């Protein structure tokens, strides 16, 4: 497929937007899904100040902006801002006309139906796309890993979900979703850093904490053991330089923040950790397929990038599951973008071409057609 006619794949994450052309092996544009609005009035005339900034530009000017993520927990809470992000994707990042390319969007499972309908409506009515499809993120991650059977643990910035898939069929009754993901871990890290006397309050300072989290955090294989080690020696302490040059030391916070994935009670969330959620999801599946699911636990999304997370998940599942069960956790190196890569594979398949919702079908049936044609 050439760029003239190739479908466009946009993976709208709560934290990052990944966009590019179907058939490519990586997204061309990756930028934070955020909108920044000035906190102060501009006084220098003729500087061409805008009333809002998108993505990297908002990130670089964050010192004077208040930042807002339009997607929270995988659900769009501000459609005007969402439109700005899509506009930015088409016209500034990919530099293509939206009416010339079919578009594939992604979504978290168990999302409100209205979210899909509105997405469909904006794409057809505002951007005039010729064809449209929306796909479940975890399913795409499985495509990207080259499997048709497996259970995908996809954890991004806004949503963590577990989707079991057998021979290409998803099992909707066993899908589990947790609204506990990267952004909650960032908030938690903000809180435990405050105990050390480092206060991060503004939306811009939260971005600094997110960077600390991405660079320094890891998952402990044995949490209690690691806490003892941390108390005895300073071997796990790392220093981090803040943008103003001040250096702060980060100790047991490095593994305390991601621990919330396995112990959501740390955040006051009454729910099992990702290991229990995965286990429960497998238990809801038919007894004949469980063995295949245990042997293909595929991780995807940015929140699965912590060092040590695959080993810890493996250990926890071994403790939960029957003793004879062979458990394999697969953490592909490109898992940060595997949803996008799966979308790129799907949209370039010849068999997929009859699956698109065309403009004509949309005009006949309205936004509700998305529930019939996309599952």
UniProtKB/Swiss-Prot annotation:
Taxonomy of origin reads: Eukaryota, Fungi, Dikarya, Ascomycota, Pezizomycotina
What Gene Ontology terms describe where this protein resides (cellular component)?
cytoplasm; cytoskeleton
Write out the GO MF terms: ATP binding; hydrolase activity
Q: Where in the cell is it found?
A: Cytoplasm, Cytoskeleton
The protein's job, in short, is:
Actins are highly conserved proteins that are involved in various types of cell motility and are ubiquitously expressed in all eukaryotic cells.
Q: Where the protein is mainly located, per its record?
A: cytoplasm
Q: What EC designation does it have?
A: 3.6.4.-
Q: Which gene encodes it?
A: act1
**Is this entry keyworded Protein biosynthesis?**
no
Identification of the protein by name? Actin
């Amino acid at each position: 497929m050439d760029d003239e006619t190739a479908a466009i794949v946009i993976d709208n994450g709560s934290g990052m937007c990944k966009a590019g052309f179907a058939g490519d092996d990586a997204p061309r544009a990756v930028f934070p899904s955020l909108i920044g609005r000035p906190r102060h009035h501009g006084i220098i005339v003729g500087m061409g100040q805008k009333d809002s900034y998108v993505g990297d530009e908002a990130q670089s000017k964050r010192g004077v902006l208040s930042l807002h993520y339009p997607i929270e927990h995988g659900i769009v809470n501000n459609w005007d801002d969402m439109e700005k992000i899509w506009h930015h994707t088409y016209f500034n990042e990919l530099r293509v006309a939206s009416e010339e390319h079919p578009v594939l969007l992604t979504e978290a499972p168990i999302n409100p139906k209205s979210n899909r309908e509105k997405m469909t409506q904006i794409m057809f009515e505002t951007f005039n796309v010729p064809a449209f499809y929306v796909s479940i993120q975890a399913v795409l991650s499985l495509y990207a890993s080259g499997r048709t059977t497996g259970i995908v643990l996809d954890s991004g910035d806004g949503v963590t979900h577990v989707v079991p898939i057998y021979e290409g069929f998803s099992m909707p009754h066993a899908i589990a979703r947790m609204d506990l993901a990267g952004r909650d871990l960032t908030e938690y890290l903000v809180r435990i850093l405050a105990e050390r006397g480092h206060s991060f309050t503004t939306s811009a300072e939260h971005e600094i904490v997110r960077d600390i989290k991405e660079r320094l955090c890891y998952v402990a294989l044995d949490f209690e053991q690691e806490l003892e080690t941390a108390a005895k020696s300073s071997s796990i302490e790392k220093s981090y330089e803040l943008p103003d040059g001040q250096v702060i030391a980060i100790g047991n916070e490095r593994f305390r923040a991601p621990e919330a994935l396995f112990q959501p009670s740390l955040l006051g969330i009454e729910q099992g950790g990702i290991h229990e959620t995965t286990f429960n999801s497998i238990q809801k599946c038919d007894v004949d397929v469980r063995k295949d699911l245990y042997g293909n636990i595929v991780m995807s999304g940015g929140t699965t990038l912590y060092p040590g997370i695959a080993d810890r998940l493996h250990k926890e599942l071994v403790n939960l599951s029957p003793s004879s069960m062979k458990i394999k956790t697969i953490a592909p190196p490109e898992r940060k973008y595997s949803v996008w890569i799966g979308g790129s594979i799907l949209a370039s398949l010849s068999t997929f071409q009859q699956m698109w919702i065309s403009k004509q079908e949309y005009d006949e049936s309205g936004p509700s057609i998305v529930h019939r044609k996309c599952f």
